[in-house]
Amino acid sequence: MMLAEQLSPEIQSSITIEYLNSSGQALKRKVIRNSFISLGRNEFRDLVLKVSDGKLQQNFVIKQIQLFTRFIRDGKASVVLLPENIQLLISNCPADKLKHFMKTLLIKHEAGKKEKPVNERTRLLSGLPRMFETISPVQKKDVEQANEMRAKANSETPVKGKGLSHKGVNGGNRCQQKRTRTESSNSLIADLRPSKKPTLSMPKQIRLSTEQSLVLNTVLSGRNVFFTGSAGTGKSYLLKRIVGALPPKSTYATASTGVAACHIGGTTLHAFAGIGSGKASLEQCIELAKRPGVRQHWTSCKHLIIDEISMVEGEFFDKLEAVARAVRGKDEPFGGIQLIVCGDFLQLPPVTQASSQTKFCFQGKSWRKCIHLTMELTEVRRQTDKNFISLLQAIRLGRCTDDVARQLLQTTNHKVERDGILATRLCTHKDDVEITNERRLQQLPGESHSYEALDSDPMLVKTINAQCPVNQQIQLKKGAQVMLAKNLDVSRGLVNGARGVVIKFEEGNKNLPVVRFLCGVTEVIKPDRWVFKGHGGIYLSRQQLPLKLAWAISIHKSQGMSLDCVEISLSRVFESGQAYVALSRARNLEGLRVMDFDPKVVRANPYVLQFYHQMQKERALRQTSLDDFLDKENC
């Protein structure tokens, strides 16, 4: 069952209230570190922003506003009240809640322009008691009224004025003169009206399954959680929602690999920790973590998210736990940091030296005292065919029955190619991937088109390469097999991993590629932007075409992807869980072709199987205890 998370028209954040003069300078400033901001209406049905610190409150009647939302992903936004010349700077607000709040404010304000305001004389003589009523949720009619007013404004002659370059809540750009001052000191009382206001839509609802909602609520209760689940159960999506529900200043989203970190808008666990590989002595690691910049990570962190935990080595996890206690000066597990850990130990294991034995995190000394609760997502979303889901579950547990082997062997003859789009080959070794893609591209006739990325800091290109899913340079030709590296339009099937072929290039100085996708959509692919955190908490970005060559891709790089048509060679599988990760990338059995299959490559680590068996046993005991308690209560 899917549940739509109801986001409230109230947010909790830090806020700075600035009273500006006509030049945009702050005459008076008030900072509230922990504020509650509510959207509602007063006795005259005016739109009102109520700001409270828990003791005192201040109401701001909204007449004209400007919204600045460029840094909304970081939990920051600004509301400028005109003509009062008051600026509200919101920060450290959970991103999902802030997006919903700002979208609601925008729609309600635009829709309200249709209503005739109450004049001052009527207000003075009304005798109505003061009141504040929380705003009702956005309805379809609000959006229709807002768009009606926008259409009317668009039909008028646009007026240009000075102001900030601004990206609005709904994605509209304002292209004005660039200012040299900071946002907090800008004069925002200009006769600014965008040349064309974009059409508004309903605020996006966050849809979670019952299982996912339970995990999210457990996280918000402050408990240390490890949640797991097989491939395609929505772990990454849930992690993004968890990131969006926590205060940004004290939340650090990390993952064992750069690509996984990029998917959740975070950084690598090693970059956050600042202790290198962790092979040094504990004393040396503590000294490394106490360096300026690194220490600030540890001391400001209240919520640490770790994705792809299966690839984190157990001894490294233990060392992090000890470092956290030492640097933070607290004896609680992990120095009192809330841990939100995600992954599937039945997928890819930690990368270790050939001579070393794999040690998973759950085998570490600190795991049990750090993790309060283990939860499992069981509802598979990537695949809908119950037979294929059952086959994958058997492979995940290292079981390859005669029936499973027969079905996989039959895929050898599957014709997964369609409309000139070939199957992507999943390879166990990344060297094979590069050789295959380069060779197949060179074999194509015609002119090669090169696309260089625009990086925020060319000096840190190695860091960007490690975290960004697309290369610094992309070479394409007509007929090149490609896949999307980012969700562009989920409703049209343009999702991360969607397969396509380059059919032509747009004429002009940019020569943008035109791609026909397997889902039936033909699209001009334009550069997109990835933003992620580097060392020291600095933000890095790359602007590049969201495309990758797709004749081949490594199993490691495919983790978290859903592929339309895939060919797998399992003869060189060398790790437990690798065959499962590869096979579970396919959306269905019809889009899968397995070459040189050997049942011996299907294996699961026995220690991991034991861990999951124990986990399910403990969960069954908890459920039995809960049922007994409820039975007694109902007697």
UniProtKB/Swiss-Prot annotation:
Family statement: Belongs to the helicase family. PIF1 subfamily.
What name does the UniProt record give this protein? ATP-dependent DNA helicase PIF1
Q: Where does ATP bind?
A: G229, S230, A231, G232, T233, G234, K235, S236
Q: Which UniProt key words apply to this protein? A: ATP-binding, DNA damage, DNA recombination, DNA repair, DNA-binding, Helicase, Hydrolase, Isomerase, Mitochondrion, Nucleotide-binding, Nucleus
Pfam family, any one: PIF1
GO-annotated molecular function: 5'-3' DNA helicase activity; ATP binding; ATP hydrolysis activity; DNA binding
Q: Where in the cell is it found?
A: Nucleus; Mitochondrion
- Does this entry carry the keyword DNA damage? yes
Q: Which cofactor does it need?
A: Mg(2+)
> What are the EC numbers?
5.6.2.3
Return the CDD domains for the record.
DEXSc_Pif1_like, SF1_C_RecD
Say which enzyme class the record assigns: isomerase
| Cellular component aspect of the GO annotation | mitochondrion; nucleus
Entry's InterPro entries?
AAA+_ATPase (IPR003593), DNA_helicase_pif1-like_DEAD (IPR010285), P-loop_NTPase (IPR027417), Pif1-like_2B_dom (IPR049163), PIF1_helicase (IPR051055), PIF1_RRM3_pfh1 (IPR048293)
The reaction(s) annotated as catalysed by this protein in its Swiss-Prot or TrEMBL entry are: Couples ATP hydrolysis with the unwinding of duplex DNA at the replication fork by translocating in the 5'-3' direction. This creates two antiparallel DNA single strands (ssDNA). The leading ssDNA polymer is the template for DNA polymerase III holoenzyme which synthesizes a continuous strand; ATP + H2O = ADP + phosphate + H(+)
Instruction: Tell me the DNA-binding residue spans.
Output: 578-597
Renumbered to this chain, region (Disordered) spans 150-187
Q: What does this protein do?
A: DNA-dependent ATPase and 5'-3' DNA helicase required for the maintenance of both mitochondrial and nuclear genome stability.
Q: How does it assemble?
A: Monomer.
Q: Name one GO biological process term.
A: DNA recombination
